[in-house]
């Protein structure tokens, strides 16, 4: 834990980490029912030399069966209220601010991304803060609380987005992914959008395309 006021967080640094060097930073948020360690393993696959990865734990504890603990950013489905999202966004931002202060990344090279519910958070916490983030990564996700989101971003600068989805996704349908992409298109976002013949998951092809996108954006 970075300190008591922020979310528990896994920090992944390059192997030969030099605290005097100004690295980029990537904030990665896990999905509903998962935990902060879930996406940390992607760090060396995405780029193992140029970035510090910040993987916060979602704030809401939940039981996911077999005695296992999981975590959520906000209540799922129809139970989600705008206040739930605003609270999660605030908690996330406190944690990101702390990590930025501690690791001193290149302020013009900070990205935010997430998988599933973490992708929803990316839209609400990342696309609303073009003053902080250079680009956004939305993996197998969809937009929730559309009005809350569009009210905030309508007059903001639009950061580039990498977005991917599996055509066989049974958790968040490919239609929901495509509808979200279309809405973001309408608001002027530049999106690299990829579909893969996969379920609700992240595959090597996703990482390969994401690496290419990061190198160009």
Language model regions located:
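Serine-hydrolase catalytic machinery in alpha/beta-hydrolase-like enzymes
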Residues: 3-105
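Conserved alpha/beta-hydrolase "nucleophile elbow" surrounding the catalytic nucleophile
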Residues: 30-32, 113-115, 166
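Active-site loop signature of alpha/beta-hydrolase-fold enzymes
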Residues: 34-35, 61, 144, 170, ...
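Short, conserved loop/helix-junction motifs that constitute active-site signature segments
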Residues: 45-48, 152-158
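Alpha/beta-hydrolase-fold catalytic nucleophile elbow
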Residues: 57, 113, 137-140, 164, ...
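Primarily recognizes the serine-hydrolase "nucleophile elbow" in alpha/beta-hydrolase
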Residues: 108-156
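C-terminal catalytic histidine-bearing segment of alpha/beta-hydrolase fold enzymes
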Residues: 162, 175-217
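Short beta-strand/loop motif that positions the catalytic acidic residue
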Residues: 162-165, 169
């Amino acid at each position: 834990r970075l300190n008591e006021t922020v979310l528990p967080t896994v920090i992944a640094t390059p192997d030969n980490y030099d605290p005097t060097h100004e690295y980029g930073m990537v904030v990665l948020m896990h999905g509903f029912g998962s935990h902060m360690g879930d996406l940390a393993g992607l760090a060396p696959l995405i780029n193992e030399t140029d970035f510090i990865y910040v993987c916060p734990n979602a704030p809401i504890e939940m039981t996911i069966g077999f005695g296992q603990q999981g975590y959520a950013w906000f209540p799922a489905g129809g139970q989600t209220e705008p206040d739930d999202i605003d609270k999660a966004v605030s908690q996330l931002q406190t944690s990101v601010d702390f990590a930025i202060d501690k690791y001193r990344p290149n302020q013009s090279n900070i990205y935010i991304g997430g998988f599933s519910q973490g992708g929803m958070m990316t839209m609400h916490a990342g696309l609303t803060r073009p003053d902080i983030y250079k680009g956004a990564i939305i993996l197998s996700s969809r937009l929730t609380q559309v009005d809350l989101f569009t009210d905030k971003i309508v007059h903001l600068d639009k950061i580039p987005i990498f977005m991917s989805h599996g055509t066989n996704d049974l958790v968040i349908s490919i239609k929901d992914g495509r509808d979200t992409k279309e809405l973001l298109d309408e608001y002027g976002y530049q999106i690299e959008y990829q579909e893969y013949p996969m379920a609700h998951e992240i595959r090597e092809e996703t990482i390969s395309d994401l690496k290419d996108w990061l190198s160009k954006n």
